A protein has these predicted regions:
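Structural motif
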Residues: 97-99, 128, 197
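Ferredoxin-reductase
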Residues: 1-77, 133-135, 163-164
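Reductase modules of NAD(P)H-dependent flavoproteins
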Residues: 130-237
């Protein structure tokens, strides 16, 4: 977790759901082989109205150009940020229920929307999170998700899926397939026949298996994979 100070009395003001892009704040630092700044998108995990700070959740990938740079920063150092980069403009009660199928650090956009639902007493949208990881130690924001589901079980539920589970693990294992999705979405009736939206975010291989390669930021493209098998429509993903 990286916490950045904002000017006193100000907040990020980002829309839900949206991201921002980061680069090194000093010219000449963290550049590619053409001398251009390395730029990476991240989704903040602090709510847009939180004053005085902005928090990013970043996984350390060895050899990652910007990852190595940001993990080398010290307290008091800065990062150049620009945004927002809008994704899905969240509207309370637009859908009866939503499903999130995510992997790794792809969980941060889901957390941004879940926080928005939780913070709005008028938003009755029900939400299911399917979060795939390799090991139990890889689960980001686990406590936050479990606390949310425990506090409002009638509105939120969480399913962790592990590829390499520890002994005694009771949750789903292996890859996220149609059976895992169908079972997880059953409680809140998140079915193709209902008023639903499914959000998918994670490594390219996972995204392709779940819904097919995305055409653009705002266009799913042809729907294939697990969600197509379950008869969801392109407009629902």
């Amino acid at each position: 977790r990286f916490v950045f100070d904002l000017p006193e009395g100000t907040s990020s003001g980002l829309t839900v759901a949206s991201a921002l892009v980061c680069k090194a704040s000093k010219e000449g630092e963290c550049v590619n082989d053409k001398g251009k700044p390395v730029i990476r998108p991240y989704t903040p995990v602090t709510a847009p109205d939180v004053e005085g700070k902005l928090e990013l959740l970043i996984k350390h990938y060895k050899g990652g150009a910007f990852t190595e740079h940001i993990f080398g920063l010290k307290a008091g150092d800065s990062v150049a940020m620009k945004g927002p980069i809008p994704k899905h403009p969240w509207k309370a009660n637009e859908f009866e229920s939503v499903g999130f199928i995510v992997g790794g650090s792809g969980v941060t956009p889901a957390w941004q929307i879940l926080q928005a639902i939780d913070a709005n007493p008028q938003d009755k949208t029900k939400a299911t999170l399917i979060f795939a990881n390799v090991t139990e130690e890889d689960i980001l924001l686990r406590k936050e998700f479990e606390d949310l589901a425990a506090r409002k079980p009638e509105q939120f539920q969480v399913h962790f899926v592990l590829d390499k589970p520890p002994s005694g693990w009771k949750g789903p294992t292996g890859y996220v397939n149609s059976e895992v999705v169908k079972e997880a979405f059953k409680k809140f009736n998140t079915t193709p026949e209902s008023n639903v939206k499914i959000f998918v975010c994670g490594p390219p291989g996972q995204v392709k298996a779940i819904c097919g390669p995305k055409k653009s930021m705002k266009d799913q493209g042809e729907l294939t994979g697990t969600l197509a098998e379950l008869q969801y429509k392109k407009e629902q993903v």
